[in-house]
Design a protein with these regions (language model features):
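Extended low-complexity acidic/polar segments
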Residues: 1, 143-148, 286-289, 316-320, ...
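Structural motif corresponding to alpha-helix initiation and N-cap regions
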Residues: 44, 136-139, 389-390, 429, ...
Length: 547
């Protein structure tokens, strides 16, 4: 038995199989919590002896408890409000499998909206690949179905389509030039904009389209955090692009409505938050408390694969003239990374194409060469999804750079990515076995906005089985073990968050963040892990969710 000398515990979990993750196959039957932390682990008889008259005791009845799960890459502050407030045209959730289906949902929403008011909607990433029409709706489709309201519909984070009223409000016409790091699609015959906007071009429209109000934002965050608890997630690393979510999180915490922990990653390029302001304020990674803290800063090099805007050396398979979009030049990237690195802010750089991978590695190597610091824990978001060459892996290991791959992208839209990127570049898609063998540190992030749920159990199942939602067992030789997959969301994820002394294992002294599962994920078929029922989630020794 392991314990710390303290008064009667507040809570005891007993008669279970508690996988502590402190070492390979480490288990116990019971644990005790005082305040927010674990104070003892052992057999049920040993731990129950500590109970006092007011100790709450929960009989696990043989169920399995694991450390609370962490998702290291989400857009959570936007996710909940989007699900609650936007017109839902996502084919993963509703019956929107053709352009006509999407138009019907938009027209229904417009029928009950005042004339001239905005209709804001969201679809799914790469939905054009799955629609029967094999294309997104354009402004002409939207104009016919919704003639009296400006319409904006996003398909993932990298493409937005507007109708003529929306484009007019944003002053986008045939003469509007592409913004840096963005693209306005034009009809090759007429020169008129089609309504499809990529990357930074979306911002032109979003500046005139109404945002959520502040109360909606707060309620959406609470909604999304509670969704996380239903899948055993107790910590998320949330990418925020403006100040209101940061303020909202603080107020939610003060109001007692924050039931999962958040490490915020403010965007410092293409956002209303600047690295200069964070640096001048003196904020460093780790500022905050056990519930809300600064986890680093986020910046993006290229566009998204789901918009065919990730930047590759070779062109896209289905568009020989398209190499993707660079959103920030190397000198600006180097300058920003250097300033943040020097100020004690960990950098999390979005890079999806191989050209962007190399730019990120160049920037990190430049920063560390000028200001050596071993424990920076800088990250490359989406590194490890594909094109992890031996040279890139060596640079990652040598520089102490963390990879944050997103197997959820492959799980949901891998077939569409194969179509546009080509099998040659994806022969080693999501090469987790190879990455681990070569010493690269990888942690799991869903990249969840409102397009698919935050669900590490789904991602763990995909890592182990390699079975994708679209039916294929994809690159089975890159399977990893159940232990390795869980580490991506527990022990390694906690280390990535600079929280390895507080989270990731169930040991005395650690936070009592615990997920209780109906079955043992180590004892069932790998594909079934995604369907495991989460019976209970505790955060800081308190039950925050119960099925």
């Amino acid at each position: 038995m392991k314990s710390r000398p303290l008064p009667y515990p507040d809570l005891i979990l007993y008669n279970g199989k508690i996988r502590t993750f402190a070492s390979e196959n480490s288990t116990c039957e019971a644990l005790a919590c005082s305040g927010s932390r674990i104070v003892a682990t052992g057999t049920s008889d040993e731990v129950r002896r500590f109970a006092g008259p007011d100790t709450q005791a929960i009989d696990l009845k043989g169920r399995v408890a694991i450390p609370g799960l962490t998702d290291t890459h989400v857009h959570l502050s936007e996710k909940g409000t989007a699900e609650m407030e936007l017109v839902d045209c996502r084919d993963f959730y509703v019956d929107s499998h053709s352009v006509a289906d999407i138009l019907q949902r938009l027209a229904t929403a417009a029928s009950s909206a005042p004339k001239g008011s905005w209709i804001i909607a969201h679809g799914s990433p790469m939905q054009d690949f799955r629609l029967t029409d094999k294309r997104f709706p354009d402004k002409h489709d939207l104009d016919r179905a919704i003639p009296d309201n400006p319409v904006s519909i996003s398909f993932g984070a990298h493409i937005t389509v507007g109708n003529s009223l929306a484009l007019a409000a944003a002053k986008i016409n045939r003469d509007t030039a592409d913004p840096a790091g963005g693209h306005i699609k034009h009809d090759p015959q007429t020169g008129e904009p089609t309504g499809e906007l990529h990357e930074r071009a979306q911002l032109i429209l979003k500046k005139v389209a109404p945002e959520f109000n502040y109360l909606q934002l707060k309620d959406g965050i609470v909604f999304a955090l509670n969704q996380c608890l239903q899948r055993g997630v107790t910590t998320v690393h949330d990418i925020v692009r403006y100040a209101e979510p940061v303020r909202a999180y603080q107020e939610i915490l003060k109001e007692g409505r924050m039931h999962a922990r958040v490490s915020i990653l403010p965007r410092v390029i293409e956002s209303m938050i600047e690295s200069k302001s964070l640096i001048e304020l003196g904020l460093i990674t780790g500022f905050g408390n056990e519930w809300l803290r600064v986890g680093g800063v986020k910046m993006s090099i290229d566009g998204g694969i789901t918009g065919r805007n990730a930047c590759f050396y070779d062109p896209y398979e289905d568009d020989e003239h398209n190499h993707g979009i660079i959103r920030i030049q190397q000198d600006e990237l180097n300058h920003t990374v250097q300033k943040c690195h020097d100020a004690g802010l960990r950098c999390c750089v979005h890079a999806i194409g191989d050209r962007a991978f190399d730019m990120a590695l160049d920037a990190y190597e430049n920063a560390v060469a000028h200001s050596p610091r071993k424990d920076h824990r800088h990250r490359i978001e989406h590194m490890g999804n594909w094109l992890s060459t031996p040279e890139r892996m060596q640079r990652m290991v040598r520089g102490g750079i963390i990879a944050i791959p997103n197997i959820a992208i492959g799980y949901y839209v891998g077939d569409a990515i194969l179509d546009c990127v080509g099998e040659k570049r994806l022969t080693k898609a999501f090469p987790f076995r190879t990455l681990l063998k070569n010493g690269v540190i990888i942690a799991g992030g869903s990249d969840s906005p409102g397009y698919w749920p935050v669900d590490p159990l789904r991602d763990i199942a995909a890592c182990v089985s390699r079975k994708m939602r679209w039916g294929e067992v994809w690159v089975p030789e890159e399977r990893i073990s159940v232990s390795e997959a869980f580490a991506m969301h527990t022990t390694t994820a906690s280390w990535v968050g600079f929280e390895e002394n507080d989270k990731g294992t169930l040991e005395p002294g650690k936070l009592a963040d615990i997920a209780v599962l109906a079955e043992d994920p180590f004892a069932i078929d790998a594909e079934r892990i995604k369907d495991l029922k989460v019976e209970m989630t505790l955060v800081g020794g308190e039950v925050k969710y119960q099925a």
